[in-house]
Amino acid sequence: MEDVFWGLMIPLLGTTLGAACVFFMQGRLHRSVQRGLTGFASGVMVAASFFSLLLPALEQSAPMGRWAFLPAVIGFGVGVAFLLFLDHIIPHLHMNAETAEGPRSRLKKTTMLILAVTLHNIPEGMAVGVVYAGVLAGSSGLTAAGAMALSAGIAIQNFPEGAIISMPLKASGMGSWKSFFGGFLSGVVEPVGAVLTILLTSLVVPLLPCFLSFAAGAMIYVVVEELIPEMSAGEHSDIGVVSFAVGFMVMMALDVALG
């Protein structure tokens, strides 16, 4: 159980260390740096969705024969729909955006910025939680090392996210500690979501392939709806694409080497 605890907390550690950059760096991150970090995070999330979630889901559904794709397809679709639903009911503001999404709200821009990253982190916490739930249930295709690889990959891409959220908060006039706390707070949802997912999945172990693909669908939604537009906005640049490839390769290597 100690390994599970650390596996759930490592992603939050990545966010916390990234948010701590606010104490050592001044001003906003350069636009090209933001693009690079966002592209890297996108690559990690896409690779994690495929290698750590969808592939195990398909492997566990193999006894269904020609219908083995059904749990993965259904779970993936429901995961996308779930994030789409949250996107419409939670007021939030994406990085470098002028207008907020979701219902009208009197919340401060800084609060809605934190909500945007928190919304982004929900599927990451679910992904870690559902993989560890599979490990605890002894499901085939899921190992403790593979689960730790996913946690490490999420933590790596959480580091730049922590900086991306805390530094604009400080640049907007917020104090260093409050900015750090804002970045940290956006990542707290991950271990909370992971624990809730473990508890829920443990009740319906036969549906694990659906839960795995659900988390994958939610993560892909975040990448397509939020991260890819952010890394491609403004003047043309290859930084986002190259960083995406690097992030994908890093996560793929982690999953294969440790999984």
Give a label for each model feature.
Residues 1-259:
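Intrinsically disordered, metal-sensing/regulatory segments
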